[in-house]
Amino acid sequence: MQKFEGYSEKQKSRQHYFVYPLLFQEYIYAFAHDYGLNGSEPVEIFGCNNKKFSSILVKRLIIRMYQQNFLINSVNYPNQDRLFDHRNYFYSEFYSQILSEGFGIVVEIPLSLGQLSCPEEKEIPKFQNLQSIHSIFPFLEDKFLHLHYLSHIEIPYPIHLEILVQLLEYRIQDVPSLHLLRFFLHYYSNWNSLITSMKSIFLLKKENQRLFRFLYNSYVSEYEFFLLFLRKQSSCLRLTSSGTFLERIIFSGKMEHFGVMYPGFFRKTIWFFMDPLMHYVRYQGKAILASKGTLLLKKKWKSYLVNFSQYFFYFWTQPQRIRLNQLTNSCFDFLGYLSSVPINTLLVRNQMLENSFLIDTRMKKFNTTVPATPLVGSLSKAQFCTGSGHPISKPVWTDLSDWDILDRFGRICRNLFHYYSGSSKKQTLYRLKYILRLSCARTLARKHKSTVRTFMQRLGSVFLEEFFTEEEQVFSLMFTKTIHFSFHGSQSERIWYLDIIRINDLVNPLTLN
């Protein structure tokens, strides 16, 4: 059977941008350094607890590990496993992190080269804007107002190790590297708990999030690319022009070959993709599929997705992982926002000459709110408040200087307001700001062994300025004579920023210290 052209072209395009270096050698540092997005600056890597590791550190770790010859020692001395010696926890975790970071750099090189090889310079700023997490919300607001049903999909697991390794075979042609990756995945003791966790597919161990998230996203992208290919090809089946007619003939021939291998599956489901109003969004371990079709069509989509997973990825998908809801009667958690599309009823009084009548107008509105309970729980886990939201001091930070404590609390508050700037209602944000401000005051008072009121009176306006958000800073410039003011005038204003490239730490499992 002939392969789909689009699928093979995708593989060729990925191979075109990749030079295959030997894994764990010094050449990787030079390669990643020269093509880094930061130019002459060392490439920064997010590792344990979201701390940044420069490429210079990775280079030193790779050279050190390469000189140790761990694999040779494991063959000559099988009883002395120096790479994953669980009797020495420090070295076991240290070298497993080296392996994870090293593999993460290598497999991400093709993606960085693909971004830098843009033929037109004018498209680069536009592409960088689309990298922002907030760029998806205007799209949802524009599209979801015209849709009827929403499917919440939990992406299936567990993922077989061999499938993850096979996905990298066309990116890395160095066979020893693939064997080393397979050895690392099978030997790593926490692998089962990382991937098959019942709570979330993204509750990975912090030291190895970079590699495992990349492997997971590569795996899911193969799943999504096939659906996208069928969507694009089937959309031209309705057209009758001469150019698309040839494409229909070619695609129909491929359907015949495909039906031989998977009888009764392809022909019955290809018409699902002809829906002109169908949108798919994935975030972390979940996905959303919205459509304007009927409830019967959505139920058939649910059956199709379950069968698709069994045919192509060889695992059982539980039907209850796909939930169907009417868009106007439900809300969904999306990237930390609680989103919904309610119907607002407006009564308009119309006066025509001597007669007057009321017009009942129904309008849909895309709302994005801040979930209060999860964020208060995150602050509680970070020891900023109790479970009920009562602010407490953070004893761990009492050894820092006063300005460092103020800066840390202020930065967390500003980041929260920056990330949730698109919220329709900001009452929850001001509640979180109150918790952080009072927790900061109690931490400083505990450090200096004084009361909160005495310490806040001594700092005065300096203490309040550390918790100013971007909107409040602009507002304060307009009224420079006023120090104390209440900034609640723009609670319904939504601002989407194009510089947010990752989810806030308080939305994900906490990594705050």
From Swiss-Prot:
Keyword tRNA processing: yes
Subcellular location: Plastid, Chloroplast
One GO biological process term: mRNA processing
Disulfides per UniProt: none
One Gene Ontology term of the molecular function aspect: RNA binding
Function: Usually encoded in the trnK tRNA gene intron. Probably assists in splicing its own and other chloroplast group II introns.
Recorded family membership: Belongs to the intron maturase 2 family. MatK subfamily.
Protein name stated in the entry: Maturase K
